[in-house]
Amino acid sequence: MERSALQWVGAPCGSHGPYVFYRAFRFQRRGGGRARVLSLGDFFFVRCRAEEPACIAELQLLWEERTSRQLLSSAKLYFLPEDTPQGRTSDHGEDEVIAVSEKVTVKLEDLAKWAQSDFSKWKCGFRAEPVKPMDVGKNGQKEALMRYRQSTLNSGLNFKDILKEKADLGEDDEDSNLLILSYPQYCRYRSMLKRIQDKPSSILTDQFVLALGGIAVTSKNPQIFYCRDTFDHPTLIENESICDEFAPNLKGRPRKKKPCPQRRDSLNGIKDSNNNSESKAVAKVKCEAKSALPKPKSNNSNCKKGSSEDKSKIAVGEECRADEQAFLVALYKYMKERKTPIERIPYLGFKQINLWTMFQAAQKLGGYETITARRQWKHIYDELGGNPGSTSAATCTRRHYERLILPYERFIKGEEDKPLPPVKPRKQDNSSQEGEAKTKVSGTKRIKNENQKSKKEKDNAQKPQDASEVSSEQEKDQESADQKNFTEHPTAGETKQPNQGPPPLLPEAARPLPMEKIDVTENSSSSEKAKEEVPHLSSFPSLSMPPDEDTVLDATVTKRLHSSADTQEDTKPERRIHKAFTESLENEPPEMPFSTFPVQLPTQSDMEDDKLPEMADYIANCTVKVDQLGNEDIHNALKQTPKVLVVQNFDMFKEKELPGSMSDDSTFGYTPLLYSKGNPGIMSPLAKKKLLSQVSGAALSCSYPYGSPPPLISKKKLNSRDELSSSLSQGPHVPNSDPIAINRPSVIQHVQSFKSKEERKSINDVFKHDMLSKVDPQRCDFSQHCLSSLAESYVPKTDIQDCKDKMTEKRALQHSRVPTFLADFYSSPHLHNLFRHTEHHLNNEQTSKYLPRDMFRESENISTFTQHKHQEKLNLNYHPSLHQQEKKATVEASSDDQPTDLSLPKSIHKQTAKAPGPGLSHSSMAQQEGKGVSLFQAASSQAVSLDCNPKACRVSPMAMTAPKKHSELLHRSGKQQAQRLENLRKMEGMVHPIISRRMSPQNIGAARPLKRGLEELDKVISEKKVRAVSPLHLPKETSVKEKVPDAEGEGSKSLHGLHSGSVLESHKFPLSAPIFPGLYPGTLCTGLNNRLPPGYSHPLQYLKNQTVLSPLMQPLALHSLMVQRQFLTSPANSQQLYRHLATATPVGSSYGDLLHNSIYPLAAINPQAAFPPSQLSSVHPSTKL
């Protein structure tokens, strides 16, 4: 048949490679008869050869091959059973046909010839009753029938125009009257016909009939068959009309890469018009892309040459494979030498990444920087054949490239092996998580990058450069390495500097340090980092940091480094750090007098407090991380950016903490180290288990990281510590910002070991306390880390306070390694604070035994702000770094209008610091406490003693006020001191509670005992139920109460309790007491249990009740007004409440301040004075075990 007689009908319906597909074609009948249109899905009679029997063909595909200009078709042939080799059997139905197993590809002209035989003799098939055209014309049934036909018979293609063409041509009787069904369809059809046999034919067009298997045929003499079997036709292969060689190459699912090569060609102007075969084109594109890759080897030129010259696929493939092999060898070798070996190639889109393809595609698009700038990583992903539906394809591809290939790309380009680009935190809450994830993803690579960066920084630091230069360089390095987490840091550091005043440089130094630390922590496995960091740290102290701060920083950093080094089993870094610290100490100017420090620190703290409002929110969002970060650094960073810097390890946090906490009084809400990085307030079950096991272990023996039992504390040391605490109480105390130490062998362990013996030594040197050094340094280190961190986070400390706190801290640490981890282990930051508070309380209590409680109480009353800060510091004395961190976090959080961690009570110190003017002159807070500054100093000393007192007085969970016994002690300074000594002895007899004491309001808030009303408080005070509370600042309150035994006195006490009392309250739980008798059975609790009333509930009880611990749920998220209302419930307290409000809010009476003053005072309120037990019970259901 002439080509002119054949033509396509309708527009193409698709294309694939060289094929263009159509839905129908028209051919001219023989003899000049009417044209006929055959469309996809049509059944028609054909005769393959003149001598062969007629059969039915089903037209399944029509296409034109552009390269050869062939018009082709694919059809399935159906023969009657008798026309098959097996013949008809009894099993064959009368309407059955058998299909040829293979489709036949036939040129259109041949197919047209096949269809023009005489088929009048064909009599088989079921003669269905056609639907009358008049019936179909009613109610749009024709259109419905057409739609049915299109959707069912034509694979959803639109055949409207084709049908119109057919209608215009008109149909013969023999046209479109064949239909072959599947056997199930046929059965349904016959069944439906039986059901509607008495109905008119129009019912066949009913939608229900059609849905149930009815078939509406409009042709005049429809013949319906069914097919359920196939056979192999013996002679079709011999038919010259059948040309299977033209069959379209469509087997299998089209590869996802196929469209990519085309796009790449268009992008690179390599459009190949001669794509004879898709596979060939793809191969060419691949090779070209690979050749474009700037590879150290010159093989790609061969590959490129081959593709350009149309070499055979085999040759091209071999060359490409050779190039790929050479590339992979070079890549693996380089990455191994770089200490970031490629161990497992990840998957993208359910397909393992082909590093060679990825590298070539990236190079073709211009390399990493260009692709990132142009946001073309999705192109790389498509090149790799990823899942097209992936929404994170670009990010995942880029991160994999950064970790697996980017270092090598930079190497071959001669670029510097810079740290991997930081990951941008998605949200503030998840920033820490994401940062960790990022570091994990690129951990191996980053380790080396960071190590190199650390080395560079080390060199810079070692050079005699200005502090600013060193810090700036370090900042640059670390910013580049951790832009994601620390972009905010530089600003934070800068903001800090003005705020800090005397130690402005420290923040910068600290800032770089934290960055390094983050890297280190991220790659804590490498001891190199610790070594490298040591020089940096040493350089930092050499910066113009105040001597005190330097000392603290040195000690803390040393400890941190030590911890990391210990974990790495590399002591050299520790030695270096110690040396660096000692050198820095030696180089540093003599420590400033304590008198000077208190003034400066309060001012700084005040300034920070002012800043804090912003910080609080961020801290609240990322409680866990905040604690770890340098208090000031975090504080400033948070202020500047809601995004919280993500720090992988606590080591980093501690480093930051050291400089920040040393320089800043502001306290961050402490977050337990054990909390999962992702969820600041949530402790993972594993962590909790570890905590509990560690707690039990700690309680059992002095060797436990939590701290040696009080009996291990020598009375001499305790006495000296008491003296120290008293002397410290005389001036503000700035606990060393020591990292929190934790038994956990992971990051937490590093943190625990952070506190270096050197730091203790520096503290001892500073204070000339040999006693402290005598204590087991390691235990002390651990407890010191915890306590100092806690103290730091809880209360802003003045430099003097820092020194004093350091001494007390050392002693306390030496005496008892109260584990701050317990706080860390708390399920929620609130619990954590409680724990820290109690732990700190224990330590303070031990000292307080020696220090007159009157002094403590007085100091508390004198200046809640100073006292609290200092008290916190005192509490922190044992773990200054920990306390500083926590204190700063709490102070900052409280000073910030928004709490650092809502679950953590805001440190009253912060509140007080905020409210009062800068400096110890926070007399408004002090007045709030109801005592003069001198009292504050005394109080601080007392606080120290209280903190030091190992004996924790039992305070009913709600009693905010100190237990009667303790209050009496507090009331009577002489008695207090005696009782303190007694308590100390008891503490010695008891195992140090694993909970860390916390003086800060956070601790108070952490203390759950808020349930009892003020009257109950009085009763509690009178009763010995409150015994569990260590005589922290409560003594002050107690003394006040003693002075004012009436309800008003109680109210004032409760008010003070909000500040100081609350701190005590948080410390209420005896530090020495086991976490809870119920929680910890056996020897762990034995010593403590003796002293705890049966109903006593330990702060760690929260661990049992995680609903209370939920980080999302503040321990008691009561507005200050609520708290005040509670106070107002008792008339006597109302005055105190208002007085408290007046004093607490003077500096900033913003809602945030109120929240801080009262929510965190809730801790104070916790003092049970404010809240009736019923009210608090719902919030803290597990108050009692």
UniProtKB/Swiss-Prot annotation:
Pfam families: ARID. Residues 252-261 have a biased composition (Basic residues). PROSITE patterns: ARID. It comes from the Eukaryota. Residues 248-281, 413-550, 713-742, 883-932, 1033-1058 are annotated as: Disordered. Residues 462-471 have a biased composition (Polar residues). The ARID domain mediates the interaction with DNA. Residues 321-413 form the ARID domain. Belongs to the ARID5B family. It is found in: Nucleus. This is AT-rich interactive domain-containing protein 5B. One of its GO terms (cellular component) is nucleus. Keywords: Activator, DNA-binding, Nucleus, Transcription, Transcription regulation. Transcription coactivator that binds to the 5'-AATA[CT]-3' core sequence and plays a key role in adipogenesis and liver development. Required for adipogenesis: regulates triglyceride metabolism in adipocytes by regulating expression of adipogenic genes. SUPFAM superfamilies: ARID-like. Residues 447-461, 473-487, 1034-1053 have a biased composition (Basic and acidic residues).
